[in-house]
Amino acid sequence: MICSVQTLGITGIQGSSVVAECYISNGLLGFDIVGLPDAAVKEARERVRAAAKNSGLSFPTSRITVNLAPANLKKMGTHYDLPILLSIMSAAGSIRRPRSTSAFIGEVSLEGTLRPVSGVLPMALAAKKAGIQALFVPKENAAEATLARGPMVFGVHNVRELVAALNGEVALTEEPAWIPERKDSHVPDFKDVMGQENVKRALEVAAAGSHNVLLIGPPGSGKSMLSKRLPGILPDMTWEESLEVTQIYSVMGALTAKEPLVTTRPFRSPHHTISNAGLAGGGSNPKPGEISMAHKGVLFLDELPEFKKDTLDMMRQPLEDGKVTISRVVGAVTYPAEFMLVCAMNPCKCGWHGDPSGRCTCSDMAVQNYRGRISGPMLDRIDIVVEVPAVKFEELRNRAEAEPSAAVKERVDAARKVQNERFGEESGMCNARMGPEEMRKYCALDEASAALMKQAFDAMGLTARSYDRILKVARTVADLDGSETIQPMHIAEAIQYRAVNLGNR
């Protein structure tokens, strides 16, 4: 007898419909799973057999073949345990055949309890798209599944409970839609930072247009402290952005039953020893890397020159495209990677180059070699470069409260509102993402601004990409200023953010 049970698969963060087909036949005793399963799926044979017996079900002593269709799609993960078990029990006549409009997800333990799995939200969204009416998941994953706002979701504790429900002996209660609670944000505030007003202004401009930033300054000047406060002035995430980011964290298994939705902008700060796969994503079964975990948020790279050169250069394409593609023999996986890059570095190896105290022990050649670890093409993708001077004693002694993040955020929100009206709110585009067509339309310069731009282009030896970056930053400065056109003072401020000489661009 053949029986089919609906389930779901996942590739990257894209869910898809999968059918678990079971055929029980006479012949030598055996249990085979086909349909391009990975090791975790193949191991389901032992988990399913033990779970069935410990749940009071009679496991067939015949030849069992389970096919996970479509067979050309790589099947990865332990969430196939439950549909495999149900297809076998249905084919054996031990339980009622599940409806074709119901889908099942879950890992089973040897005693028959259902354990939470990763990637439930992308699969729930795929179930919604496929017209699935009822989705059965482990109880711990129920809140996450309801975020899809699609099929009815039923949280299940164990196999016994589910079998009783399928046989009509008990009725399961539909899970209510999870609604995020309003709570105070724990993001650090700009008011804690004394001085550094020029740097705060640069970060405000960066947040308003989603521009990439490089902070250069001696140890203890506040580079990390300022960067960690950047998410607090970014606009609140929309529902669509939260869902997109949550799908990435769901695939990584980084969600909890109490907090199934990511509602704050991510801030990721990997160590400079991180591998290429850790940063961009990878593995035999490709998983998202730090650049995808920072999607719609901030990726902070401290001690930038200490990162391996090939690791930094690998980020160049994701910075342009807003996504990263990982290719393997079985296929390619694409993860979103649209983030603000914030980097920090010392001006030299010892950290004190240019300090008035003369503490620097580095030669000019050593300074150039240190800064030269960052390639010119990588620096071209950074819109704003700003020096962070050492904090003066008078500023530390000043107990007057600095401007809070909430006040800065109001200005950033106003500038983003202008950009939403300009590009269309649904596009989610910011000034930093403008293409050639948008730049011709919204970054036109008058004669005075063009003359200033030409002077800077010739004097600073700018590249075409640097020229575009300056125009985009100037457009953001104008938006913060409430100006429809780019004025010379906006160009001047944008040029100021490219004036730091690193000797390699």
Where are these regions (language model features)?
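Peripheral, non-AAA+ core regions of ATP-driven protein-machinery
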Residues: 1-214, 218-224, 327, 466-467, ...
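Short beta-strand elements
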Residues: 18-24, 279, 383-386
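Basic, amphipathic alpha-helical bundle interface domains used for macromolecular binding and assembly
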Residues: 34-45, 60, 67-77, 285-286, ...
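Catalytic P-loop NTPase motifs of RecA-like helicase/translocase cores
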Residues: 111, 301-308, 351
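Conserved alpha-helical scaffold flanking the Walker A/P-loop in AAA+ ATPase domains
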Residues: 204, 261, 265-266, 276-299, ...
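Walker A/P-loop
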Residues: 215-256
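Conserved inter-motif catalytic segment of the P-loop NTP-binding fold
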Residues: 239-275, 282-283, 389, 430-437, ...
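Walker B catalytic acidic pair
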Residues: 296, 302-303, 314
